[in-house]
Amino acid sequence: MLDLSDGCSAGGTDMVTRLLADLGADVLKVEPPGGSPGRHVRPTLAGTSIGFAMHNANKRSAVLNPLDESDRRRFLDLAASADIVVDCGLPGQAAAYGASCAELADRYRHLVALSITDFGAAGPRSSWRATDPVLYAMSGALSRSGPTAGTPVLPPDGIASATAAVQAAWAVLVAYFNRLRCGTGDYIDFSRFDAVVMALDPPFGAHGQVAAGIRSTGRWRGRPKNQDAYPIYPCRDGYVRFCVMAPRQWRGLRRWLGEPEDFQDPKYDVIGARLAAWPQISVLVAKLCAEKTMKELVAAGQALGVPITAVLTPSRILASEHFQAVGAITDAELVPGVRTGVPTGYFVVDGKRAGFRTPAPAAGQDEPRWLADPAPVPPPSGRVGGYPFEGLRILDLGIIVAGGELSRLFGDLGAEVIKVESADHPDGLRQTRVGDAMSESFAWTHRNHLALGLDLRNSEGKAIFGRLVAESDAVFANFKPGTLTSLGFSYDVLHAFNPRIVLAGSSAFGNRGPWSTRMGYGPLVRAATGVTRVWTSDEAQPDNSRHPFYDATTIFPDHVVGRVGALLALAALIHRDRTGGGAHVHISQAEVVVNQLDTMFVAEAARATDVAEIHPDTSVHAVYPCAGDDEWCVISIRSDDEWRRATSVFGQPELANDPRFGASRSRVANRSELVAAVSAWTSTRTPVQAAGALQAAGVAAGPMNRPSDILEDPQLIERNLFRDMVHPLIARPLPAETGPAPFRHIPQAPQRPAPLPGQDSVQICRKLLGMTADETERLINERVMFGPAVTA
């Protein structure tokens, strides 16, 4: 794999190739004389960019001079013999060596060429620049973050770039798998904006806030109604978060509170009744927490079965007992002469970590050649233009968002996905509003699936599942650790049914370690990994009665966890096809979070231990009020030059040399005054007008979009990101994504409607297992299986 990222253009491109390097790819980074400019991007540790050091581990580096004819020939020779080329920016780094990324794909038929830009290579906003905060604004994530009124709160910097990188890695590995199938590579015009819209907090995917986009008959443009759905309380040494959902969890909390007489009525077993009375219950919980430490509260809550976790600070995460025990953190010489704790990576394969092995190389450390000849591959068996996963069969035991997204990604690309469901414990995404037969979330997440109703606790049900495993390629599950084994389907058992099977799983804190048995709700994962603590803003401070955190309405990291799982599962299937052996792969949601924000965690840990000098990022990203009712835009000032250009747009060039704002450190120190000065300009313009004027001057800015705005975004329309999906049980068409990225040789996702529970049970058992009508009828009558009425 040829990595042409400069570490600056299209932020996060280095992460794409790091992901594939972790999985064993030979990644050769091509740098110009003097090295990539990304080596100096802040924050820096002992003079080296932390982000560059983290995202270029496990790679090699060769220096080629684009002005030297012999080096230009060497570059083309490398591209000709590569499997994948990853480039970034417009026109891209490859163009300096004589051929753009698209031209390389034209020239070398086998090559998969990925071009990553902020907004895509063409379209009305292709020249726009993006930062993470700009992507939060334009993707709709910002509109769901912050108080009900007042300034919206930016999510932590880094999540958007890391999410886009995972989506890009998935897209390029899909194209590579397709090359193995049909013999032809591809060119992918990848937009980070597209990726963040689809994979961070998608407005048109499994998400509780989707009502803003499709349920209302009007154009609802409100803000979050409840930022305390998962309440946080101060305690003696910090904060704790509760996530009380099930009746048994409420009863545990009630015991902890001393069985208060006012709340003994069984009606409080229902969430709605508790929410109505929560102001009164909250007084008791606050009193309980006030005099105890985080550790004491978490231990007591766990003993009573109450979902609770500490709201930890980033500086404490890398040293936590859990991450240390499972090897998610390793002590490494991240930069020359400096050792510090670093996240190992996302992936666990057959119980072993596939992650950080070697530090980022020095520029030109290696020769411009590949380590080995390409691995032999069998002759192509598929046709160009087909779906890459045609012929793959997936048994999907996944639930809610992370599990559903994993299987959807395969179904959208042609796999036969069989969703195996229990009559007694249906998938939470099947919950609907009164009178509805199908939820929008289920329709989006389980399109292109078949539905099998099967009791896996019944001996006959187990036998049927085992027979299906023998006929399948992969099993996907995201149960609490130990659940699949308790059902009788450990990986060893599945492997005995089918030695080629891939088991891909995910859980909140992984399947081993001190926290592995903790309850795995997303809000608890965010709190335990430091995300909640940094999801805050000086511009949106609450009154003294409320904590300052605003992550309650995000669904991060569920959607990106599904994509990380898909990437790992596909890598395991590629390895299976080469070696004949299956694999057990697993993803920890908490470790996904830590690796998404690795630069922040490493900087905070290094600062806490004072291992070397750290220079922070001095960019100023802020949310500004615009003309209209609750309208906002985001502006990013990353350099003195950008500030000068911005002041010209504001019509106040004298601010460029104002001692409060003229230098980066001064802008950080005088942030509130800068925000006030810029707000005077933005408040007289619409968000699109303000962003457009700044983008024309080369300054990253973007309007805060709501879901309805996203459907009208001219760049997304130009790129055909969505098309209407019709489900016979839903009154109106739903906007649905068309695929992970625009490919040349892979068609858009099909749109077969999501099934009702057990809808395809009979068909599956007859077609795959050769059962007769009498057999399937008996199994349904005996409640081993459920489904529609049997017909001969």
Curated annotation (Swiss-Prot):
Looking at its record, which EC class is this enzyme? transferase
User: Keyword Plastid: yes or no?
Assistant: no
Please give the start and end residues of each transmembrane region.
Answer: none
InterPro entries on file? CoA-transferase_III (IPR050509), CoA-Trfase_fam_III (IPR003673), CoA-Trfase_III_dom3_sf (IPR044855), CoA-Trfase_III_dom_1_sf (IPR023606)
Q: In its keyword annotation, does this UniProt entry include Transferase?
A: yes
- Gene Ontology, cellular component aspect: peptidoglycan-based cell wall; plasma membrane
Annotated catalytic residues: 558 (nucleophile)
User: SUPFAM superfamilies annotated for this entry?
Assistant: CoA-transferase family III (CaiB/BaiF)
Q: Which UniProt keywords apply?
A: Transferase
Please give the Gene Ontology molecular function terms for this protein.
transferase activity
E.C. code: 2.8.3.-
Q: Name one Pfam family in it.
A: CoA_transf_3
Role of this protein: Probable CoA-transferase.
Report the sequence similarity comment from the record: Belongs to the CoA-transferase III family.
Official protein name in the record: Probable CoA-transferase Rv1866
- Organism, per UniProt? Mycobacterium tuberculosis (strain ATCC 25618 / H37Rv)
